[in-house]
Amino acid sequence: MTTPTDPDGPEPEAPEPDPSEPGPSEAGASGPDPGPPPGCPAHGGSGIPLSGTRFQTEPTSLYREMRRDHGAVAPIVLDGDIPAWLVLGYREVHQLTSDPVLFTRDSEVWNQWDRIPEDWPLGPMIGRKQPSILYTVGERHRERAAMISDALEEVDPILLRHHTERFADELIDGFCAEGRTDIIGRYAMLLPVRILAKIFGFPDEQAPGLVTALNDMVDGRERALAGQRHLGESMTGLVAEKRAVPGIDVTSLMLDNTAGFTDQEVAEDLVVMVASAHQPTADWIGNSLRLMLTDDRFAASLSGGRHSVAEAMNEVLWEDTPVQNAIGRWASRDTSLGGCLIKAGDLVLLGIAGANYDPQIRTDSSALTGGNNAFFSFGHGEHRCPFPAQEIAEVIARTAIEVLLDRLPDIDLAVSPDEGLSWRPSPWLRGLVELPVRFTATPVVGGTP
């Protein structure tokens, strides 16, 4: 089983850079500083809109062009012509996430707040005065991270797999007799939140509403704020219920923590946990299945065993990572990153997909399959995804794929992979809109979808 890199162990070793190209820190290593590259505002360059179809249709080419024109750090503009930086270099992302003092998660220091309207579509992703773990720094952040990790560590992986198998069978029973279905809409998008609802203590019937709210929120469009409100209200209600009647679930364990967190703080952290877990896990399932159904290296072994599932999942975290770009850090003072002058208060985004494609570490794409876990898909540094959360996501995704292949052994893509598949319109998350498949109709196993 492929396991995510242990954040408490030694740092992962990146693939060897190409010796024919200078490393990102070599420019200006001796002699005078050559100054920022042409894309920096110091040269009057304009920002690249973080939107458009190319983030869905050809992200590899897009990031290559951005790197060619601007280097490891590119100026971008967000909705409303709000300036920011996108870090595309592998080592620069590592540097950014390794210094929580210079590059802080305290969004209060942002120098653009006076330009942000209250109904800004990206508001749910860039919070101001939100008491969640995302924007907490220092010792308080470490205490909150410990609270979350301690609660998630109590999730029994054997029981988690059992719940995932049961819910997977129920969902597959809903379409297995039809001979064709959309794996995204009827399986991948429904399964993770069912499991999360179970381990967090939600009633099963609330899962569909959570799916809709999460999709609205993370796509960052006109319904983003409504999705955020629904999710926040759901978590506040859940915390109140568990405060009154504790159960055997993650929420009750968080409330039992002795570090003195308020119910509102716990509710805010639950929003972060569910939003960070559901959609990326659903996309991990969908993207891995797409790879297995379209790539001969994996398609040939669909019915021949499970050995390729872990390889496909690992490769997806390099090639089609569910989180493309992430709202990242704010510079606490003037500094330089990748040769660009970053002003105090500037917003700096983590270009996770761009860093994965960095030619300084990607001399041969085939070298990144197998057991290389040095990707940034789970983040890095103090604000990385907690290791227990990584394990939970992997158990859910791998079990979902294995159960589907067991139940539908001759599953095949029902459309042309070049023309029949489209990606969701989001520069943040990479996932398919649909994954139409066909298979030999099979009987139900007794589940109720």
PLM feature segments, named:
Residues 2-449:
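Cytochrome P450
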